[in-house]
């Protein structure tokens, strides 16, 4: 899967734009026997990429000129996921499955503070996280047909939370007005991060292979997780999502009859804390289309979507 992303950020009247493209995933699935299937693939687990600068007026010098501070916040990197999964149909209506993944990658954060006053020192605080660990996901799905045109699907998932094999690096440096290093301090912490226990439940209703309406709830137990061996840095995250997809004609022969139209909304509480306080709650809405390519009845799709998040 390939993706092209164009994102607009806005805060306190200041706007910026970011564009990126990536290979989202490479995955395959195949049947092992009548009741069992297997899947494997590679996909991004998380991505960090931002570079923001904030300017503040903090005082005046002896000449009446403003003394300004410049704060640059930068983050980059991400985690990749290689997975293999098995699914088994226990009964005609009930299926269970499990995915085992290997997570690897690194993420870097840096905060740089400087001043327009030539006598002031500047500072750089940076953190780097290197992770090589595993992830285990379990799931179950129950499908019930109600007559000829109605289908209800119920699902539940669980992701195992644990301490990850990881290394964390903390650095703090100060520089004088000539950019000469004055002080340097740092430390290394092993196995300082953890994944949250994650629980999810969901339901979809399908009418005549044409209209699908679904809802999903996820709880991530971030409050129990460590960040650089410190607890209490996070809060549990709750997310509720609602969505719908409409396919005009499942057996259609014309292009616009087999385009999939999608809408969705979601609400989520923050897991990160800012100065010990919970961050902003998240509200989002999306709209999208699934365009068939190569063949109207084929499985290949070009997905186009737009999302607004506040």
Feature names for model-found ranges:
Residues 1-310:
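Subset of outer-membrane beta-barrel
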């Amino acid at each position: 899967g390939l993706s092209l992303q164009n994102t607009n950020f806005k805060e306190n009247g200041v706007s910026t734009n970011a564009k990126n493209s990536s290979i989202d995933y490479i995955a395959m699935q195949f049947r092992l026997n009548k009741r069992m299937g297997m899947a494997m693939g590679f996909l991004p687990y998380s991505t960090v990429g931002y570079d923001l600068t904030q300017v503040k007026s903090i005082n005046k010098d002896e000449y009446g000129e403003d003394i300004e501070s410049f704060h640059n916040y930068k983050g980059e990197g991400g985690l990749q996921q290689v997975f293999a999964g098995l699914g088994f149909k226990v009964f005609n209506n009930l299926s269970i499955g499990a995915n085992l993944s290997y997570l690897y990658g690194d993420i870097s954060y840096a905060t740089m503070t400087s001043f327009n006053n030539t006598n002031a020192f500047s500072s750089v605080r940076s953190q780097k996280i290197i992770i090589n660990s595993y992830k285990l996901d379990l799931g179950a799905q129950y499908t019930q047909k109600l007559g000829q045109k109605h289908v209800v699907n119920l699902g539940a998932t669980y992701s195992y939370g644990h301490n990850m094999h990881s290394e964390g690096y903390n650095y703090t440096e100060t520089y004088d007005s000539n950019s000469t290093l004055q002080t340097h301090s740092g430390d290394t912490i092993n196995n300082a991060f953890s994944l949250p226990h994650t629980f999810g439940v969901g339901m979809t209703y399908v009418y005549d292979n044409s209209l699908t309406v679904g809802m999903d709830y996820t709880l991530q137990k971030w409050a129990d997780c460590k960040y650089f061996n410190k607890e209490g840095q996070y809060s549990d995250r709750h997310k509720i999502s609602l969505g719908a997809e409409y396919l005009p004609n499942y057996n259609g022969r014309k292009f616009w009859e087999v385009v999939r139209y999608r809408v969705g909304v979601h609400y989520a509480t923050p897991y990160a804390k800012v100065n010990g306080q919970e961050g902003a709650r998240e509200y989002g809405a999306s709209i999208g289309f699934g365009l068939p390519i190569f063949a109207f009845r084929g499985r290949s799709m070009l997905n186009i979507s737009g999302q607004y998040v506040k």
